[in-house]
Amino acid sequence: MSGHNKWASIKHKKTATDVKKGKVFTKIIREIVVATKESGAQIENNARLRKAIEDAKEANMPQDNIKKAIQRGTGEIPGAIYEEMVYEGYGPAGVALIVEVTTDNKNRTASDIRKMFSSHNGNLGEAGCVGWMFERKGYITVKKSAADEEIVMNTVLEAAVEDFKSEADSDVYEIITLSSDLETVKNVLKEKNITVESAEVTMVPQTQIALKSDNAKNMLKLMDALEDHDDVKNVYANFDISSEDMEKLNA
């Protein structure tokens, strides 16, 4: 199983706790504000806003919160001014990381990110130091229990996806598309009544670094620390941890 999918699974388990902390709401509200400011409030013409609202509903965010976030994005009501920033660096064993943030204070955020890297055997690098190791792609998952593998595979191959994976130790099918084709492939699956578990634009590493023992433990702690920060939107990394080692770490 890929490191990306393992981390996606860990994040999924954390979601319920994060909602209680309000972290998920905070991050989704910022995404709605930025998406609205960027491309307007009409969801039929704004795929990014549409995805953010879907995430908000999945997290059971009150409709009033969604409405106010959109109004902040259009400027109808006042609010913080957010900037989107990207940080790049290295984690344990030279793992490459890309950290996307949405912040109203870039100096504070940069300081926080730098401290997290250094306290987990990593270091923050210069812009572009690791970005070339990743490609922006569409990433879709479908629960194996939701549909037959052959049906899902034939459906997505007809839609000209880049890759289809069905790993033995995973409970989902993984589908990789061009980032521009994500919505199209997602809609093709829905037309075939195949339930999509998740669909997002992500950064896929061209190669991965296998981690074990302390390096694996420190890497997961760094990922956890970064994703727990209110300003952090996404974290991408090119590590892989075997299922056996992951079970030991979770024991």
Curated annotation (Swiss-Prot):
Keywords: Cytoplasm, DNA-binding, Transcription, Transcription regulation. One of its GO terms (biological process) is regulation of DNA-templated transcription. The keyword Cytoplasm applies. One of its GO terms (molecular function) is DNA binding. It comes from Endomicrobium trichonymphae. It comes from the Bacteria. Belongs to the TACO1 family. It is found in: Cytoplasm. InterPro entries: Integrase-like_N, TACO1_YebC-like_2nd/3rd_dom, TACO1_YebC_N, Transcrip_reg_TACO1-like, Transcrip_reg_TACO1-like_dom3, YebC-like. This is Probable transcriptional regulatory protein TGRD_462. One of its GO terms (cellular component) is cytosol. The keyword Metal-binding does not apply. Pfam families: TACO1_YebC_N, Transcrip_reg.
